[in-house]
């Protein structure tokens, strides 16, 4: 690992020399490329330089211990050595984490899809709870959310909702939420007090720029229809809702949230690009990302990543055996503790692969 960091430092010095050359300064594109590479290396290099400085200080302190005669002074020096060794060990771990491969999508905004699974109306109410939880979480992170399509009713039941979460790092945090979520609780309409089990699926797709994926328009059927929303003169007079069908894959995307046909079309294509990119990436690297269909599973009660048990006020994440309490607090969007634990577990597994 230290050899890799030495190479990083060498490249960092080369970039600093190159970026000051007149022929480079006049090439704006090259300057941006080099500046980005330097920024990517900077944290690693700063850590490595600090590590070397502590290593040199530790060596000098050990030499001092060998020549020191006074026992009280020796005790002080031993304490200093222990402190320096701990600093080096901590820094070594940080450097190892910094060198782990990064998900190229981590900084991206996302498209999130929530669908009610098994459980009838109770599943729809649970899907609505999840939607509220994620929008509240986005608010706490100062991210913006925007609905693309929603299929629900006035009773608070959501069959399906597709929405954007726009903010740097949204994918790095919310990617851990994809999969089947299960709820166990007594419905308000259940007179006997019997606990019902329901599910909802969550898909998290990184947003894809138009330049990142090429869609052949001959492969897309565009249908325009009247919105099934609240109604009004706009719905009566103008068909603004859009349905896209990608013929080769069978993917279907609908958007009817906006009153503008153009805005609905743009949003629908954004979702289609994200879904197509997910399918493409799943073929290229099955270990890093699954296909969208595998991601959300079949939403039956046996498949699950997480269970929300209301009678026991307990959340269980089955992937890592995590247990948390205070469901009302969690459902208000306070997810960082759970997500931090999942991220740490992922880093630990990656470190095992490095060993």
From Swiss-Prot:
Pfam family for this entry, one: RF-1
Signal peptide feature range: none
Keywords attached to this entry: Cytoplasm, Methylation, Protein biosynthesis
Transmembrane segments: none
PTM comment, free text: Methylated by PrmC. Methylation increases the termination efficiency of RF1.
Cellular-component GO terms for this entry: cytoplasm
Superkingdom classification of source: Bacteria
Location in or out of the cell: Cytoplasm
Positions where N5-methylglutamine occurs in the chain: 233
Primary location recorded for the protein, binned into one broad class: cytoplasm
Single GO MF descriptor: translation release factor activity, codon specific
PANTHER family in alphabetical order: LD18447P (PTHR43804:SF7)
HAMAP family documented for this protein: Rel_fac_1
Family, per entry: Belongs to the prokaryotic/mitochondrial release factor family.
NCBIfam families in alphabetical order: prfA, PRK00591.1
Task of the protein: Peptide chain release factor 1 directs the termination of translation in response to the peptide chain termination codons UAG and UAA.
Name of the protein in its database record: Peptide chain release factor 1
């Amino acid at each position: 690992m230290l050899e890799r960091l030495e190479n990083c430092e060498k490249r960092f010095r080369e970039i600093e020399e190159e970026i000051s050359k007149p022929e480079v300064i006049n090439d704006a594109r090259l300057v941006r490329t080099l500046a980005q590479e330097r920024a990517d290396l900077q944290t690693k290099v700063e850590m490595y330089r600090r590590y070397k400085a502590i290593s040199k200080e530790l060596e000098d302190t050990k030499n001092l211990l060998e020549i020191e005669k006074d026992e009280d002074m020796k005790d002080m020096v031993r304490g200093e050595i222990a402190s320096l060794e701990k600093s080096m060990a901590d820094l070594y771990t940080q450097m190892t984490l910094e060198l782990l491969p990064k998900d190229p999508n981590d900084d991206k905004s996302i498209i999130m899809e929530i669908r009610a699974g098994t459980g009838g109306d109770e599943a729809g109410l649970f899907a609505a709870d999840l939607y509220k939880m994620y929008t509240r979480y986005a608010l706490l992170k100062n991210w913006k959310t925007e609905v693309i399509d929603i299929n629900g009713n006035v009773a608070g039941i959501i069959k399906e909702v597709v929405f954007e979460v726009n903010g740097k790092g949204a994918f790095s945090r919310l990617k851990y939420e994809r999969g089947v979520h299960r709820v166990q609780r007594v419905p308000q309409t259940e007179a006997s007090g019997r606990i019902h089990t329901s599910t909802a699926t969550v898909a998290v797709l990184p947003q894809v720029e138009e330049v990142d994926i090429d869609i052949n328009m001959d492969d897309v059927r565009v249908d325009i229809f009247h919105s099934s929303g609240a109604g009004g003169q706009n719905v009566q007079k103008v068909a603004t809702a859009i349905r896209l069908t990608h013929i080769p894959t069978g993917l279907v995307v609908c958007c009817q949230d906006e009153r503008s046909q153009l805005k609905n079309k743009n949003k629908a294509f954004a979702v289609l690009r994200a879904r197509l990119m997910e399918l493409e990436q799943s073929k290229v690297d099955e270990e890093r990302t699954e296909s969208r269909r595998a991601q959300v599973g079949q939403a039956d009660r046996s498949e699950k990543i997480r269970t929300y048990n209301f009678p026991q006020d307990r959340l269980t994440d089955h992937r890592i055996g995590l247990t948390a309490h205070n469901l009302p607090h969690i459902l208000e969007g306070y997810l960082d503790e759970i997500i931090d634990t999942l991220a740490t577990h992922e880093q630990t597994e990656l470190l095992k692969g490095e060993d």
